[in-house]
Each structure stands twice: as structure tokens, then as C-alpha cells.
Amino acid sequence: ALSSAASDVYKRQITYVEHGVCDMGVVGKDTIMEMQGKFFELVDIGFGRCKFALATKKGSTFYGGFDVKTVATKYPNITRRFFEAKGMDVDIIKIEGSVELAPLLELADGIVDIVETGTTLKENGLEVIEDVCPISARLIVNMVSMKMRQQEIENFVKLVEENIDK
């Protein structure tokens, strides 16, 4: 997981690209999904691969019963859309820092967070019960720049795609 300082850099980068300060930038799909800016997402660069996942205490029955579940996350927009797509009503608590502590402190029934290896979850007695979506670094482009500098950008994108380890 990224530190909050790194996360702020990516958020600023989206803002800079969206408002034309930069033509292009590289940001994580997590930041793109959470912020939903106005830009083009052109290439999955492929590094920083991990996933968003729903995790609970081992042995919990998150999907059982009729009570509204509480979910802790750093990513409330992504979490809300995930559960809306399932037709599930959940309470979302936005937490910065160690989200995995929320179920242990009985603050939440589960968490939605970035998972790379799952080690931190296991260390805290949690398990992934559902993958939300894969994430990785993406190349984004300002919408006006794409129109004004289309050939240059397409040439650059082609170069990037030719050099991505697949």
C-alpha cells in the first residue's frame, strides 16, 4: 500500500493532468477510480499490480443475515459503487492509516483495501472473501492535449506499449 504522501502525489498528478498543467501522467487505477477525473486513461503500464479486495475476520459471514454491514476503507467511492452494484446497503467509514484494524476493534464488519500479497491481512486475522477489481499503474492524458497533440501522444503511447513487460 502507498503512504499517504505518495497517495497525495498521485492525486495532485491527476489534478495537474485534468487541468492541463501536464499533458500526461502515470497514476494507479485506485486513484483513478476514487477520484473519477476528466482525462483519458490510455495504457495499463502493468507495474504496481495488486487488487482491491473485501476482507473480514476469518470465519465471518459477511453476506449472511439482514443487518446492514459496516465497511471501513480509504476508498469510499469505490466501496460504495462496489456494493451498489451488488444491490447491498452498507455503512461506509472512511479511515486513513491502518484500515485492517477496523474489524479487530469491532468498528467495522469488513474492509475494502488494496491487497498485494495478503500478508498484512493474515497478520491481523483477516481473509479476503471477494476480489473487487485488479489495479495497476496507468498512463493518463489531458483531454485537450489529446486533441491538440494527438500524433505526438499516439507515438509516445505506441513506444510505451512496445516496451511494457507483458
Name each region found by the language model.
Residues 22-27, 109-115:
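Paired acidic/hydrophobic, glycine-rich loop segments that form the ligand-binding mouth/hinge
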Residues 13-49:
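Glycine/small-residue-rich loop that forms an oxyanion/phosphate-binding "nest" at active or ligand-binding sites
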Residues 13-14, 101-104:
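Short, hydrophobic alpha-helical packing/hinge segments within bilobed ligand-binding/sensory domains
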Residues 6, 48-54, 134-139:
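Small-molecule pocket liners
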Residues 58-73, 77, 84-85, 134-166:
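Extended ligand-binding regions for polar small-molecule ligands
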Residues 34-44, 119-134:
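Ligand-binding "clamshell"
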Residues 1-6, 10:
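Single conserved hydrophobic/aromatic residue that forms the stacking wall/gate
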Residues 4, 84-95:
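A local structural motif
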